[in-house]
């Protein structure tokens, strides 16, 4: 979009501005390991099989592969990854959560299937938390415990909202993990199901920009 704005401005000079946006946020690069065969030719991740963190072999020739440093993904070094494969395997929410949680958006990110799998497992725990609360037996409530629980949840909601607005997305995700731990450690306390559900709705709403599919499904069940 910036390119077309510059072109129109240069060719026609009909625009009253040069930049289409008030602020440009430069994002980091997506990086991945590089691989070479014995002849020094680049290999793609689909052409190798990793034996461990330091060893890999060429799937066709079964010969050792040299594992290089993680570099920005490029066609020339053949270290690109098709995100569709990870989306098909773990879901779009898992891939999105991994990307946002790995590092600040202005720094490079190291693409990792293990990292995406970790995000997938965390989302499974959030889903299970919803099921637990929906099926939880009613308990005697303690107003003071509920008040403190509400206060903590509200603090997290406000904090995460500010972090998202300031593009501190990895820190926002870290706080989202903390909110899960707070729910998990409070399930056995004397808090009413109604209180849990109301706060769970707040939790799902701060998850919406990060994992929209899961958050929408959970919100539907909480209606």
Give the ranges of each region predicted by the language model:
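Conserved beta-strand -> loop -> alpha-helix junction used to position metal-binding or nucleic-acid-contacting
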Residues: 21-30, 64
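Extended, compositionally biased low-complexity polar/Lys-Gly-rich tracts
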Residues: 24-26, 69-78, 154, 158-163
């Amino acid at each position: 979009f910036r390119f077309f704005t510059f072109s129109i401005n240069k060719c026609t000079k009909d625009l009253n501005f040069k930049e289409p946006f008030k602020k440009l946020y430069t994002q980091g690069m997506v990086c991945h390991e590089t691989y070479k065969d014995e002849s020094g030719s680049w290999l793609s991740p689909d052409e190798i099989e990793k034996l461990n963190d330091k060893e890999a072999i060429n799937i066709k020739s079964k010969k050792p592969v040299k594992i290089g440093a993680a570099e920005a993904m490029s066609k020339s070094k053949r270290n690109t990854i098709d995100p569709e494969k990870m989306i098909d395997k773990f879901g779009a929410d898992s891939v999105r959560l991994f990307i946002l949680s790995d590092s600040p958006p202005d720094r490079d990110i190291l693409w990792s299937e293990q990292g995406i799998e970790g995000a997938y497992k965390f989302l499974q725990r959030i889903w299970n938390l919803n099921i637990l609360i929906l099926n939880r037996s009613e308990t005697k409530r303690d107003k003071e415990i509920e008040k403190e629980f509400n206060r903590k949840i509200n603090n997290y909601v406000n904090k995460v909202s500010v972090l998202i607005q300031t593009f501190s997305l990895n820190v926002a995700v870290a706080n989202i993990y903390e909110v899960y731990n707070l729910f998990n450690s409070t399930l056995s306390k004397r808090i009413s199901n109604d209180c849990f559900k109301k706060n769970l709705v707040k939790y799902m709403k701060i998850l919406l920009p990060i994992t929209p599919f899961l958050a929408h499904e959970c919100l539907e069940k909480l209606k």
